[in-house]
Amino acid sequence: MSHIKIGVSHEARRVGTLLGMLLIGTPSLLWAQTCTTQAKMTSDIRSGLSDAALRLAQAVQQGDGAKVQAATIAEFASASAFAPTLALVQATSSRLANDVLQVTQIYELDASSRAERDTSDADFSCPLTGTTSETDFAISGLPRGLYGFAMVETTGDHPWLLSFLLRQDEGVWKLAGFYPRARSTAGQDGVWYWKSARTYAKADELWLAWIFFGEADELLRPANFVSSTNLDRLRSERRAATPPELIGGMSSSHPLVLKSTGAQGPATEYRFTEMFADSSEDGKELNLILHVRADDLTDPAAVTARSRAAAQAMLDAHIELRQAFHGVWVFADSAGHEPVVTEQTISNIP
């Protein structure tokens, strides 16, 4: 699917590898971290971060894992430690083709005053010059050091954002984390999904609003540990539009339970653990993605039949979902097993 979020696994929707965040900790001090935005950093820092990020982005575009590995912080450049990043580079490279790369935002994150064995979040607040907005970082277990965060945009039919966490080692900026993210789903960007979500919310179509707000968040944030004034506003709007059944969230530990009663026999119960939007294989259509818990995957035919019934139960319970999606992909999940995927076109679901 074209909206894969980490490596080559659809399930790991949140993308990126953060290298070296495993230390035994003591509480951090509030003043231990500072952020300097692009407008206020020194020219040496600004050009150093920008050049390093662009070189890394070019290496990713070329699928040159060896070059990325050579520019990675030493403790995570061994073959075994670098393997997850290498897989991510290879999965991302094919999506960038001949896109033009441009460094669009950089931040200097100074954590040089953190305690030696601090594993708490390293919090950075970055007020943006001339505005009331800010960008915030909360990086778990960040080791002491001078860091930078750089965002490289790609242009093309399917734009991407390549974000890099860099650490300065002996005057050289090296890779400490890599976070590639698609910037569009089914040909639309995050702002479009945000506006559409607002429209659905006003129409009291809360299930569509909740999904579209979520997709806007997914497309607009550069990494899971980054927030901003705009993202906070988006998340507040999503909370306000959350359907009553989802107030407590939806997860493997807190599934959404739907029951379907057939003409004959007892009710069937479906436990949904995740629901979101995603592009079709060709990037042209928007599909609804459902993850449903399965106790047994040994009989593929039975799993497929159950997944089809689960999709119909969801669409019957929330008819508005039929209007926004081309198809439904159901992932039947069972612990310790690869999910069984069933695809249906909504027009073929009675």
Can you say where each PLM-predicted feature lies in the sequence?
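Bacterial N-terminal signal peptides that target proteins for export
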Residues: H3-L19
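Bacterial N-terminal signal peptides
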Residues: G16-S28
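Short, low-complexity N-terminal intrinsically disordered segments enriched in polar/charged residues
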Residues: W31-Q62, A74, G177-W192
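Short beta-strand edge/turn micro-motifs at domain boundaries
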Residues: Q33, D123, R144, G148-Q188, ...
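Short solvent-exposed beta->alpha transition segments
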Residues: T34-D44, S50-L54, A66-S133, D217-I247, ...
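Short helix-adjacent coil turns
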Residues: L56-V68, A197, A201-W207
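Surface-exposed, charged secondary-structure patches
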Residues: S80-A81, L86-P159, G187, P244-D295
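Acidic, serine/threonine- and glycine-rich low-complexity intrinsically disordered segments
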Residues: A182-A267
